[in-house]
Amino acid sequence: GDGVGILTQIPHKFFARVTKALGMDIGGEREYGVGMFFFPQEELRRNQAKKMFEIIVEKEGMEFLGWREVPTFPNVLGHKAVECMPYIMQGFVKKPVDVEKGLPFDRRLYIARRVFEQSSDDTYVVSLSSRTIVYKGMFLVKQLRTFYPDLQSEDYCSAIALVHSRFSTNTNPSWERAHPNRFIVHNGEIN
């Protein structure tokens, strides 16, 4: 498939549970931001990119809490999608005490993301927010929930869900080009 994804609210109960199992304390709802990352498969380059993000978060006055490997089932994918599949991880960032929840915190996360994007050209930040998260990839709609078992968890709850499937007419499919994007769902023709 050319790509599909889903944008939801951050499922706090789900993340509180899975991060606790990793020994991470993310705090209360909207007290943290979650980044979804497409890293290189090569361990050295991946570790360098992860370290760079951690440094940037600290330089922007926030505390990096830890990484989570996102569970996936690549066996449901086609050969081409598996060949170029990134290493998918989530990074957790603590909200500074002097920054309000919501938009003010998301602005800080936005700046950290933009600085990181300038420093790491082989990593794609799928989303980084204290309010929403995007799960996406180069596959079909029917494969989304199977590929990402997180989405099947009973405690993964959201009041919104924007799903978008991409059929490219003039570009090659890629993991990064799958929709939805970080803030918008569109057909590529904003006039």
Mark where each language-model region is.
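N-terminal segments that mediate ammonia production and transfer
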Residues: 2-191
